[in-house]
């Protein structure tokens, strides 16, 4: 199992997100052997991290500025993001959980649609909580065979499942809830890992600008693809790796049944989220103690953020941002 911990921890670093994606590297093992006389831990691997990252310029759909010529452009938003993540592996699969607390600067103000008069916007930045869980069950481990493998191409196929949930104190007041289920494919690479999942995706959310009882919205069930990777950069002679994810959600409809009454609930577009981090194991470099402290820089691209599509008068749906942070493996 010596290859699993590094892969799992790299996956956790790559997913310090909000956002969507996500299970760590799978356990590739035959059926469990009989229990030894001295039972070991239930988990083959477990890692919990606390991290901080700074992101700029992030964007939010509808957060924009009007230029002198009357046109609109996206308003950049600095964000401070605090995260706790946990990953573990057991005989039959993996679990991954992450929670981001995202604090926006005043460019993305907090607000409510429930104030006296119906709308209020504050002079301080909004706070968002975004949680995500992904789990896998290895079909090879469950069957005690290697039937779910293609030598040299795929090491394992697993059942994959999970959910996302968020809340944010803006006037829009999103309360995203989604569930996913499908298959995960672990590719056979010389070092590190590349995993791809194909899911069915169902989302429920909230639009604070709709009137009751139509603030709660339910989107169509659509295909979703998640790709997670971590690859060591051994040729550098440094404890460096490149880690990240890509996430694709197909157009999921409007979310409302009465489109004539809520025409401003526009059709969603294909959503694409990609993040790539360059990760340095600082503990290994400085103290020769690996997997304790990581520092990272990265780039995030988000097209049609949360499915929203850009128009001439509606910006903030395309995000191109840089990030930098530090992560501590605590237990």
Language model region names:
Residues 78-82, 125-133, 173-181, 219-225, ...:
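Residues that define the transmembrane beta-barrel architecture of outer-membrane proteins
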Residues 56-81, 118-120:
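Surface-exposed strand-loop-strand hairpins of Gram-negative outer-membrane beta-barrel proteins
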Residues 36-46, 87-97, 139-158, 186-196, ...:
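Short loop/turn motifs that connect adjacent beta-strands in outer-membrane beta-barrel proteins
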